[in-house]
């Protein structure tokens, strides 16, 4: 659990957010959204102590552990991949290092024996005997092959380092997990793995992401940073966006009766909660939506930019025709073969591949 009390952050005369009071509870995943520069990453930095708030306090639950997705990909270059992941649980890692030092001593004293006994008890409590296998499981899930688990971090590619940093953040089942853009540089398969992992995560998660699909998949709540204020809403990104747009339309339609507006909002909540998939996080989200009061739905003050292309003439029905298209790399890897398709006016097409250069 994370409690944010009367927190403000100000740089010079610029106030990023002011008088924030929020509570993030276990079993929920909170998607933090806002325009670029609104203060999403700064809010996370304030929570994990990298930046002191101008006013207010931030507190974790008693004895709870906080884990953060590291953005420094060079700090760990001298360590192996396995050690880097296990260092994510600082308490367990410290115990492991102390054990190694004591067991390596030639002049082992009675006092050392008592200390070792104490360390062994803590080591067992933290499931230290499964430390490496747990780390290996995370690494494999995130696409780091077993033959690289004991490679030095400095020998990995940038994209591989991102995955190891993510494994480090997830390691040891932390009570509170902060993730800033966790899907960057991940392929579709790994993003799907992460979605499933977080959807069944039992503790508190705060995540900043520009990936709407990812936020919809994992989040039970949406935290909106907008014009210096931070507001929390039940539901994932799509629910927040669609409900706020509905509330805005109702606000603009002054002629509609209050009862009609309320009925429309209630029907929207029912439809949305009925479509929520079954997982620990989404079940929690469904319960939140079912309890949601329509008065809690407010229109967003956010304004979205629009890019409008005006063609010089009306295009024809067929925009693009592709026939027999093939491509392979210099190494002979086939990226695609004998591709045939047409794109017609009005079509919206997305290209997906497990091979990123395709």
What is each stretch, according to the model?
Residues 149, 297-304:
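Active-site phosphate-binding and catalytic loops of NTP-dependent enzymes
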Residues 90, 109-112, 275, 282, ...:
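Short, structured coil/loop segments at alpha-helix boundaries
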Residues 92, 126, 130, 276-279, ...:
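Short secondary-structure junctions and interdomain/linker hinges
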Residues 243-296:
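Intracellular alpha-helical coupling/juxtamembrane segments of multi-pass membrane proteins
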Residues 1-255, 307-358:
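ABC ATP-binding cassette signature C-motif
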């Amino acid at each position: 659990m994370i409690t944010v009390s009367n927190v403000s952050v100000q740089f010079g005369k610029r106030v990023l957010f002011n008088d924030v009071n929020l509570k993030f509870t276990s079993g929920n995943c909170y998607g933090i959204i806002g325009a670029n520069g609104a203060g999403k990453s700064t809010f996370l930095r304030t929570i994990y102590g990298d930046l002191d708030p101008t006013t207010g306090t931030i507190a974790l639950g008693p004895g709870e552990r906080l884990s953060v997705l590291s953005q420094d990909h060079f700090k760990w270059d001298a360590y192996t991949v396995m050690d880097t992941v296990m260092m994510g649980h600082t308490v367990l890692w410290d115990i492991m290092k102390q054990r190694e030092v004591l067991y390596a001593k030639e002049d082992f004293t009675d006092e050392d024996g008592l200390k070792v006994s104490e360390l062994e008890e803590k080591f067992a409590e933290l499931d230290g005997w499964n430390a490496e296998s747990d780390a290996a499981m995370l690494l494999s899930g995130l696409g780091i092959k077993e033959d690289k688990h004991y490679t030095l971090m400095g020998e990995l590619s940038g994209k591989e380092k991102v995955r190891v940093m993510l494994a480090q953040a997830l390691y040891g089942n932390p009570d509170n997990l902060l993730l800033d853009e966790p899907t960057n540089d991940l392929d579709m398969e790994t993003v799907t793995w992460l979605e499933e992992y977080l959807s069944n995560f039992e503790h508190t998660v705060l995540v900043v992401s520009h990936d709407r699909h990812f936020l919809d998949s994992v989040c039970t709540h949406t935290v909106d940073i907008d014009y210096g204020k931070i507001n929390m809403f039940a539901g994932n990104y799509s629910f927040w966006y669609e409900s706020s747009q509905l509330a805005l339309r109702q606000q603009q339609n002054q002629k509609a009766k209050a009862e009609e507006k309320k009925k429309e909002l209630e029907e929207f909540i029912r439809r949305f909660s009925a479509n929520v998939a079954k997982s620990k996080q989404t079940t929690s989200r469904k319960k939140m939506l079912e309890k949601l009061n329509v008065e809690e739905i407010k229109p967003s003050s956010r304004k979205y930019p629009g890019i409008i292309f005006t063609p010089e003439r009306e295009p024809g029905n067929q925009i693009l025709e592709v026939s027999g298209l093939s491509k392979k790399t210099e190494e002979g890897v086939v990226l695609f073969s004998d591709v045939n398709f047409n794109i017609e006016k009005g079509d919206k097409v997305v290209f997906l591949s497990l091979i990123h250069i395709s």
